[in-house]
Amino acid sequence: MLNASDRAIVKSTVPLLESGGEALTTHFYKKLLSRYPQVRPLFNQAHQASGDQPRALANGVLMYAKHIDQLEQLGGLVAKIINKHVALQILPEHYPLVGECLLEAIREVLGAEVATDEVIAAWGRAYGQLAQILIGAEEQIYEEKEQAPGGWRGAREFKVVAKVAESAEITSFYFAPADGQPILDFAAGQYIGMQLFVGGEEIRRNYSLSALAGNNQYRISVKREPGGRASNHLHDQMSVGDSINLFAPSGEFTLVDNDKPLVLISGGVGITPTLAMLEAALGTLRPIHFIHCARNGSVHAFREWVDGLAAKHPQLKRFYLYGEDDGVSPAADGVGLLDQARLEQWLPADRDLDAYFLGPKGFMAAVKRQLKAAGVPDAQARYEFFGPASALE
């Protein structure tokens, strides 16, 4: 545990982190990735280039410093971090490397006059405390997944047993275990980690599981991203019969078990976790409103599947919105952006509902504002980021 002096010193750096946190974390990542290339597979280089990863870490460091006296207030943030770490197989030996580079970055960016030996020592102990919290929580999850029926620890070999084009941009991949043994069940909304080798370089990625674990298989549905190393490798190089290493499913973007009306709102490839959520929710009696937004019909994946479910299950209402009418695809329920009036028209009359939404950041920010304006309680509007988490406000 930190003493009062350490906590006071860490909190005194909050103003500096508010103004210069992103510069600090950008410098930190350059130092970490150049000094310890073995950790490069754990980080998406596109998120480094865009600044998303440094911004997310800067926010995390700031929140930790602000709440150093009340760490229980960081429960939601810590849960997201732990699940991301587990899916990528972050291990105890990685933490000293991060700590070393973080403390050096604090000294170099803030300057020796501000980041004195006393400040660095306090931050060193604060980082050590955080590392122990994360290591302990992650080990507990690793052990639980290893001991669970069908579970495993580390990488497990799977085979691609099917590859299906779902739209002009999205392709589904079905994976079955190479050893033929059972696989770990998962909660709808979770994702799975994978190890890829692209151009001789290892990279790791997380992809949402887009269907429940039927037939002892996992399914992911991947959008081809311009310049995306992992997505283009999967689309162009991964074929039926190929082997791939997967890490056990993880994630805390999952359905709350109650009988409130359920609203699933997605934009683009954000549809993927909502498909598994929809499949799971249809096993209950709760009303479901499924709202999906796409650029046009050619890139709208899984329309026929959702339409088929809606025809069989009166509890399910589905609404589609296209940014443009391509003149070829079946018509949507509207054309344009998802605005306040349209969203309120498609929501259940009972606003004591559970909403889950996922898509591009701007889309999610708009949906969050609109749900609040429509009277949906903040705590019942839940969202997930495919990449590093950041604020939507």
Model-flagged regions — what are they?
Residues 1-154, 327:
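Globin-like tetrapyrrole-binding proteins
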Residues 72, 288-393:
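Reductase modules of NAD(P)H-dependent flavoproteins
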Residues 189, 270, 360:
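Short, conserved phosphate/pyrophosphate- and ester-handling motifs at nucleotide-, phospho-/glycolipid
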Residues 261-263, 356:
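Conserved beta-strand elements of the Class I
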Residues 271-282:
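Histidine-anchored nucleotide/phosphate-binding helix
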